[in-house]
Structure formats: structure tokens, C-alpha cells
Amino acid sequence: MKREYQDGGGSGGGGDEMGSSRDKMMVSSSEAGEGEEVDELLAALGYKVRASDMADVAQKLEQLEMAMGMGGPAPDDGFATHLATDTVHYNPTDLSSWVESMLSELNAPPPPLPPAPPQLNASTSSTVTGGGGYFDLPPSVDSSSSTYALRPIISPPVAPADLSADSVRDPKRMRTGGSSTSSSSSSSSSLGGGAARSSVVEAAPPVAAAAAAPALPVVVVDTQEAGIRLVHALLACAEAVQQENLSAAEALVKQIPLLAASQGGAMRKVAAYFGEALARRVFRFRPQPDSSLLDAAFADLLHAHFYESCPYLKFAHFTANQAILEAFAGCRRVHVVDFGIKQGMQWPALLQALALRPGGPPSFRLTGVGPPQPDETDALQQVGWKLAQFAHTIRVDFQYRGLVAATLADLEPFMLQPEGEEDPNEEPEVIAVNSVFEMHRLLAQPGALEKVLGTVRAVRPRIVTVVEQEANHNSGSFLDRFTESLHYYSTMFDSLEGGSSGGPSEVSSGGAAPAAAAGTDQVMSEVYLGRQICNVVACEGTERTERHETLGQWRNRLGNAGFETVHLGSNAYKQASTLLALFAGGDGYKVEEKEGCLTLGWHTRPLIATSAWRLAAP
């Protein structure tokens, strides 16, 4: 619909002045100029621009933009205020007249030209051909723009000459059709609707381009400084969460991804997982527990990849098995209760060691405890079948029983006793209880750990092996817990990065397949650890199950429950050190003996700890 234009001319007050101003914004349909060719695209937007005026309008728009400060170093706030209050602009639909009136209001001289370089000529031009006419605009200096993808082509230096106004005009962004031509090369492309677009760019050498272009702000990103700011942002956000200052926490959590993008390697990944966990806590989008068959299968898959990618689980299994093997010395009937059997990866090595024992292997019974499956299948029984087949091949008398329990606190002593009546003439079973990364989950429910330790004490095991993360992620203070977990998982991710270069076994096998498999293992291991981070940071109450504690804290808990430490022998220490030589980055992994327990860490930071326990003397 065309708008009517009336020249009020006067400066009346009150409602008359407002009506006059509104009238000045109207345009008469008779002014369109019947018979004149008007650009259809601009006309559809409500602007009248004759095809013959396109180049002139473009140049005036550019001058207006520079005058308003958009292309210069800083905008003119006074001019913007002036435009918003006192100025009356006539007929904005007549784009040419409107731009001219805006320029006349400003009445600013053209921008000064920078001095010409002594021996270089920067002749730059760009032409975009469209359906409505030709625009002669300066080229875009920002050739890295993903929106416009303008790629300047370097031309050889020529004889010195004065710079034209076009060559030094502030750069403008320009959309091209993906084609570029120069004095030495040309190409063309066709876009939708049959409209062909082409661009011609003749760029000066870098020195000349720098001299010709106006000074633009340059942002130099200091990776180390950005890393410090990233850590400060993470800690400040955690402090805001603890103080329940959600507005500050929300503002900080939005900065974390931007700061993390400047980092590389382990720091970027750790920051991404902690940033996600903070965002979930701030916006109350807590992670849901694994409740479907797919979730359970995915958790098992992550556990398997973590086992393959780094030595932590292998170290846990090896040191626990060594303690159990020494406790079973000379016994003919042995029984192992595994509080978290998973895929049963720990037990083939122990079965093989027992099979090679002088005097022959003992009768081996295994009780595997695991959570119920969402589809109610007996996954524990499938693990038992595989272990039974392996035991048969190495000629070990093997019995297996699976116990499904939603939590270890549901176990009762009678469930762990031998089935049926024991033969009084036979040697009694020697029991070992094994827990790898399971005890800390009991701390989510008050009294659950004490209940389980009471059950263990009732079956009177000869040895109890416990492997836990060497960290304190169970503090009552959220900020303390967050800070400790940030340090812990940063070291854990560093160890994954350090061990990703390929160990001796991978190098000897050669080929791209082992490297690809190692890369997959590392990525899935990072997801495995990321889920722990999310639980530590984003969850509370019974949902927060990753309540890791230090070896000293476990020593107090087990000591109060009636257990005492069994010193792990020097043989376990030596063999564990030998095991680490098989892994890439083995020089970074450190095994330490601490008060009869063994810890595995990365450089100077212990990450997991293995301890062995027995019933204390009455």
C-alpha cells in the first residue's frame, strides 16, 4: 500500500506537530514516476530506488555508514541522539532523497585519506553483478568471514601511484556467489533463479593492504591468560551456586564455553564437562539415572572402553587379584564375592593364576552381584556362562551364582553362604570380598555402608579388597567439592591425553586400525568420566552417587567397622610397575606404596587406591 506525503512545513505544537511529523513520513503514489524502472526487490520492501540511481544510492549509504561511526573507530553518540530527537526526515521510502537528507543533517566532511605507501599501489575494487543493477563497493578486508567467504588474491607490486578514494574507503562486507576472478584467474557460478553473480578482487600485497586499510582493532588471545580466566570463571560460578546467587551463576555459566573455546587438549574438554554440569545445576536440568536397556548397555560400553584406554581398571583388578591370590594360598575351596561384577573382566586372570598354582587349582566359586536389567534379562547369568567356559578350558572346577540387587544394602549374610548343607569332612570355604569403585555409592544413603560392612563381617571373609578413587568428592561444601573434583578430573584427563600417543603394543602392531581404536577408546573414556563429573556437580541427595573419598577416610570408616589393614606385598608393587610399562605415557604413571596400600597416579597426583582388609582381632 502506498503512503501519502504531505509537506507540513510548519512547526506547530502539541498534536498538530505530531500529526505533521507523521505526514512527513508519508509518500504519494504519484511520486513513483509512472514509466520509470524501479528495483523490484527494494520496492517489495517499501523503498523506491530507480535502477539508474542504484550506484549513487550505494555510495551514499556507504558514506552515511562511515559518518555515523559504523565503519570508523567509534560511533558518534551525539549524532545518534540528535537523529533520535530533533531531526525530521522526509519521505524515507524515497531511499536516495532520504540518505541525502541524512548526510545533510550530519554535514560531515569525508574521512581523511591515509598516506600512500612509497612504492606500492593498492588498487582494490569489487563488482557484484545482480539482477537489478551493479554495485561498485569496496572489497571486504575480512576474508576469513564464513558468511561471505571473500578470498583476496595477492597481486604483484606495481609502480607507485596515488591511492584513489575507493581504494582506501572503509571496508564493507559483501556477499559473493562463491566465485572469484582476478587479473590472472577467473571463474563463475550460477545460483538459484538463473541470476549469475561474480566478484572481481585485486588485493594488494599484505604490506600495502595494511597501509591502505584504516586501523582496525586487533584482538590477541593469550591462551595462558584465557586459561586462567576460564578457571576463575568456573570457580566463581561454583561460588555463586553455593551462595544461591543464580543470576550471577547464569551469567558466568554462559561465559565458560566462550573461554573454553580458546583452550586445547585436556583443559578444553574438562571445562566443557564442568560447564555442562554447572549449567544443569543452574537451570535445574538434572541428568536422569540409567533406566532403559539402551542406557545400561551404553554404561557397560563406556566401562569397557575405559578399561582398554588407560591402566586404572587394570591396575585395580591386578592388585586386588594379587591380594586375593596370596590370601588363597594353600586353600582347596575358595569363594569370591564380587560386589560389582560388570562384564567379569577381572576374573579370567585370577582363574589362570590359580590354574598354574603348584599342587593344582582349587575349587573356585564366584558370586557376582549386579543391578537389575531394565528388560529383566539375566545379564549376570550370561557373564557366568562365559567365565564357566573359560574355566573349563583351563581345567578349573568352577561354580557361579548371580545375585541381582538394586543396591548392596539389600544383601543379607545368608545370600552369600554356600548353597545347601556343607560336608563336615570337607575343608570349609575361604571367602574373599571384592569391591572395585562400588563402596562410595553407598554413602548416598545414610546407614547403607554400615549395613553392608556388617553383612561382610557376618560371612567372616579372609580378605576384603577395596579399590576407590583417591579424591574427596563428598564434602558438604559445594565449592570445596567442586574445586577438588576440578583438580582431580583435570589430572585424569591429562593422563588420557598423555597416554593417547600409542604404547609399545600399539606401535608394534602398526597400521591405522590400532590408532583409530585407541582414539575411540579415549573419546569414550572421556564420556565415561564426564558422566561422573555431571553427577558430582549437578546432582544432590540420593541422586549424587559419585561420593568419592580419600584413602584416609576409608581407613577410618573400615577401622570403625571392625576391620584392619592387610599390607599389600612388595611383589604386587613390582608387578604393578611392570604392568604400567605396557601403556603409552608409562613414565607419567606413578605407583606408590602408602601405609600398606598401593596408589596409582599421574605424575605427582594419586588417582586411585587399592587397599586390603581383614577382620580385626577381638
Swiss-Prot record:
Coiled-coil region list: none
InterPro entries associated with the record: DELLA_N_sf, TF_DELLA_N, TF_GRAS
Modification after translation (UniProt): Phosphorylated. Ubiquitinated. Upon GA application it is ubiquitinated, leading to its subsequent degradation.
Domain of life: Eukaryota
GO cellular component, one term: nucleus
SMART domains named in the record: DELLA
Tissue specificity: Apparently restricted to regions where growth is occurring in the leaf blade. Localizes almost exclusively to the basal elongation zone (EZ) for the elongating blades of L1, L2 and L3. More detailed fractionation of the L3 blade shows that in cv. Himalaya, it is preferentially localized to the basal third of the EZ, but its presence can still be detected toward the end of the EZ (at protein level).
Region described as PFYRE: spans on this chain: 431-535
Keywords, comma-separated and alphabetical: Gibberellin signaling pathway, Nucleus, Phosphoprotein, Repressor, Transcription, Transcription regulation, Ubl conjugation
Ranges spanned by the short sequence motif DELLA motif, renumbered to the chain: 39-43
Residue window of motif VHIID: 334-338
Biological processes, Gene Ontology terms: gibberellic acid mediated signaling pathway
Family: Belongs to the GRAS family. DELLA subfamily.
Protein name from the UniProt record: DELLA protein SLN1
Species name: Hordeum vulgare
